């Protein structure tokens, strides 16, 4: 078609957020490694873990998000001035994407980005990160005020907001809380001003789990490295990437994160970190994983090593651990007995199963792509209270609610 519906462009940009397989290896290889969330998999150990820079890999997030999401959003914003609600939703997601890219890369083209076809500017200037964040705050406030001023339906919405202008307004206000807190160490007065302004903004903020904002995905087959199908954004590609593409290299939990949560008695630890026998990890059906977390813990309580997370920069086979005997893990013993030809006790699978990985529940194709949640709001309010900002409730109460 000679004219593209701006709502179709909104759908594309929203789905790409978590659905673009082509860029997700950068999250796994670098971002999760630098933050010491993951370790052990070949990619994260050899790139972030070993501090091995690969420009083409590190540039993927920018190259893909800019060429697809940003360009579509800017073009659709330009052509949807007679669609106030859709235009506002497009502006909100552009603000989300610009903040994301600036958080990763720092100074980026923002105010002039994506305008080449519109005004001929093929060399947009780089805005400083401060300018990017000021742009984001301004856009979120303006877009929230614009919502509800038209009668058009946000038909391209594929999020939990479900085309509801009041939900989009609430979402925009809530994002302001996040970005205000992000700058609180470098611009504390500006941060407090933006935060407190968002709290009292028309439309309110997310105030329950039912109001969480996320992109919806479907239970579609994983695309893996399937050529043109990488442009199919309907499944959660980040979940696919975290799951892994072969039995030997899923995303193991880094010892830094694991031990911190363990020391703090964090009740979320075993919701996030699980131990599996997963000889079928190369297949797209996640049902081929046998959860043996409780059995590995019991083995540790009876003199075995128990759960052994991977250390920073190590592959899962580094700092080699002695696997439990087949008889120590009842599920393993049962599988070996029932299916001796499948090699459950071979190829070092028993050694790998005591390395905790990300729970498969977070790796399904239809897992939601989180934009912002009520839990994060409560943590932000807790931090604001601890800073002495003008928020109701104590830091302790907000933290525990989160």
Walk through the language-model features, giving the residues of each:
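Acidic, glycine-rich segments characteristic of secretory precursors and extracytoplasmic regions
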Residues: 1-36, 46-50, 59-60, 70-71, ...
């Amino acid at each position: 078609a000679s004219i593209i519906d701006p709502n179709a462009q909104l759908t594309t940009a929203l789905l790409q957020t978590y659905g673009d397989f082509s860029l997700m290896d950068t999250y796994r290889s670098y971002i999760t490694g630098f933050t010491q969330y993951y370790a052990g998999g070949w990619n994260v150990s050899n790139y972030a873990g070993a501090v091995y820079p690969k420009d083409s890999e590190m540039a993927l997030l920018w190259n893909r998000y800019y060429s697809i999401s940003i360009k579509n959003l800017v073009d659709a914003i330009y052509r949807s001035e007679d669609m106030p609600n859709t235009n506002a939703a497009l502006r909100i997601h552009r603000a989300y994407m610009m903040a994301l890219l600036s958080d990763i890369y720092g100074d980026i083209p923002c105010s002039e980005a994506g305008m080449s076809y519109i005004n001929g500017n093929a060399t947009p200037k780089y805005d400083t990160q401060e300018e990017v964040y000021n742009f984001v705050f301004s856009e979120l406030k303006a877009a929230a005020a614009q919502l509800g001023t038209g009668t058009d339906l946000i038909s391209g919405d594929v999020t939990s907001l479900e085309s509801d202008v009041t939900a989009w307004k609430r979402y925009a206000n809530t994002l302001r809380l996040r970005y205000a807190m992000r700058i609180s160490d470098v611009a504390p007065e500006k941060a407090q001003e933006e935060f407190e302004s968002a709290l009292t903004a028309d439309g309110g903020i997310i105030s329950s789990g039912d109001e969480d904002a996320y992109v919806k995905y479907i239970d579609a087959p994983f695309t893996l490295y399937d050529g043109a199908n990488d442009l199919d954004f309907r499944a959660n590609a980040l979940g696919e990437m975290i799951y892994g593409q072969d039995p030997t290299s899923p995303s193991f939990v880094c010892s830094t994160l694991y031990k911190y949560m363990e020391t703090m008695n964090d009740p979320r630890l075993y919701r996030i970190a699980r131990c599996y026998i997963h000889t079928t990890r190369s297949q797209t059906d996640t049902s081929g994983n046998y959860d043996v977390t409780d059995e590995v813990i019991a083995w540790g309580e009876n003199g075995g090593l128990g759960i052994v997370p991977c250390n920073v920069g190590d592959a899962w086979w580094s700092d080699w651990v002695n696997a439990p005997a087949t008889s120590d893990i009842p599920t393993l013993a049962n599988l070996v007995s029932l299916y001796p030809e499948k090699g459950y006790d071979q190829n070092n699978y028993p050694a790998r199963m005591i390395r905790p990985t990300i729970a498969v529940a977070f790796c399904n194709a239809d897992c939601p792509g989180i934009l912002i949640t009520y839990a994060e709001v409560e943590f932000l309010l807790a931090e604001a209270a601890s800073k002495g900002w003008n928020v109701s409730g104590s830091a302790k109460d907000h933290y525990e609610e989160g």
